[in-house]
UniProtKB/Swiss-Prot annotation:
A GO-annotated cellular component: small-subunit processome
A biological process from GO: translation
PTM sites of type N6-acetyllysine: K34, K56, K249
Posttranslational mods: ADP-ribosylated at Tyr-155 by PARP1 in presence of HPF1.
Subcellular location: Cytoplasm; Nucleus; Nucleus, Nucleolus
Major subcellular location class: cytoplasm
Origin organism lineage: Eukaryota, Metazoa, Chordata, Craniata, Vertebrata
Phosphotyrosine carried by residues: Y256
InterPro entries (UniProt xref): Ribosomal_eS1, Ribosomal_eS1_euk
Region (Disordered): 233-264
Protein name: Small ribosomal subunit protein eS1
Gene giving rise to this polypeptide: RPS3A
Length: 264
């Protein structure tokens, strides 16, 4: 007889028993995502995170999460082609307090503006706000026909393009350099910077569809809870402790005994 395991006998043993299926969502909690006070609608959604367990704290898993939300959802408007990025900077109870992290135009809007028979002019600039945020702003604009123009095309000369680009950079630098982040975001919501550029460039060549198409966050200053609470309109005095940071579970061996102290 061949020496070896009899597979038929061991088939119904412990090895073949199915593991108990645990629902992964039973170990997770829902947190509300709160937008800063610049926007009309503050509660923008919920996010999921694994509960605090041992040294792994739930709020640490939430900090740094980036949420991309359409401006239509912020302002309760049907038509909006701007997307704002918000980053979680702190967790208070079951609320994730976010801050501005960037802006972008939707792809369909960008594609709808690019057409034949006109010149597309783009510019970008790196600017620092008064409260220490370094932003990179991208601007785009398109030439349009003069009044009473018969010719089909409206192409700008290279010299005019350079002048318009210079004007774009000047206005973007001026608008951001003299304001803090909150005021810059308030200007980005209606895109007053794009309208200012359009007015200023009319004397060089008539423009239309002038937008700040993208804003990137390059550097942020050291985190201050007081400033974040001001952005959320809750004042600087906030002594709330995070609900999940009450204590961390410490693993001990079964036969663990504390060391004997020589003196008390």
């Amino acid at each position: 007889m061949a020496v070896g395991k009899n597979k038929r006998l061991t088939k119904g043993g412990k090895k073949g028993a199915k593991k108990k299926v645990v629902d992964p969502f039973s170990k997770k909690d829902w947190y509300d995502v709160k937008a800063p006070a610049m926007f009309n609608i503050r509660n923008i959604g919920k996010t999921l995170v694994t509960r605090t367990q041992g040294t792994k704290i739930a709020s640490d898993g939430l900090k740094g999460r980036v949420f991309e939300v359409s401006l239509a959802d912020f302002q309760n408007d049907e038509v909006a082609f701007r997307k704002f990025k918000l980053i979680t900077e702190d967790v208070q109870g079951k609320n994730c307090l976010t801050n501005f992290h960037g802006m972008d135009l939707t792809r369909d809007k960008m594609c709808s503006m690019v057409k034949k028979w006109q010149t597309m002019i783009e510019a970008h600039v790196d600017v620092k706000t008064t409260d220490g945020y370094l932003l990179r702003l991208f601007c785009v604009g398109f030439t349009k026909k003069h009044n009473n123009q018969i010719r089909k095309t409206s192409y700008a000369q290279h010299q005019q393009v350079c002048q318009i680009r210079k004007k774009m950079m000047e206005i973007m630098t001026r608008e951001v350099q003299t304001n803090d982040l909150k005021e810059v975001v308030n200007k980005l919501i209606p895109d007053s910077i794009g309208k200012d550029i359009e007015k200023a460039c009319q004397s060089i060549y008539p423009l239309h569809d002038v937008f700040v198409r993208k804003v990137k966050m390059l550097k942020i200053p050291k985190f201050e809870l007081g400033k974040l609470m001001e952005l959320h309109g809750e004042g600087s005095s906030s002594g709330k402790a995070t609900g999940d940071e009450t204590g961390a579970k410490v693993e001990r061996a079964d036969g663990y005994e504390p060391p004997v102290q020589e003196s008390v």
